[in-house]
Amino acid sequence: MLRITALSSLSQAVTLRLEGQIVGRWVEELKRSCEELRANGDGMVLDLVNVSFIDTTGLALLSELRHGKVSLVNASPFITELLKGAGLW
């Protein structure tokens, strides 16, 4: 399961707090949420503080998002190592 919470921000960027695992069908849910919120052209921050695992499809999506205006923040040491291994951190 993946919980996605949009947080209000004083900056132009929208922050999404993610909780759970970025795997399987939840990858498409995250992609849909990002596309909807990025429609206005502002940047986006993905807060990974409560993400416990990311599979290969999740890493592929994060790689795709990083080519846009998306920043990844607050990853745990385990998630940081996964992201480093994929060249995303």
Predicted regions and their residues:
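Amphipathic alpha-helical interaction surfaces in cytosolic regulatory modules
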Residues: L18-W89
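Short beta-strand/loop segment at the start of cytosolic alpha/beta domains
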Residues: M1-R17
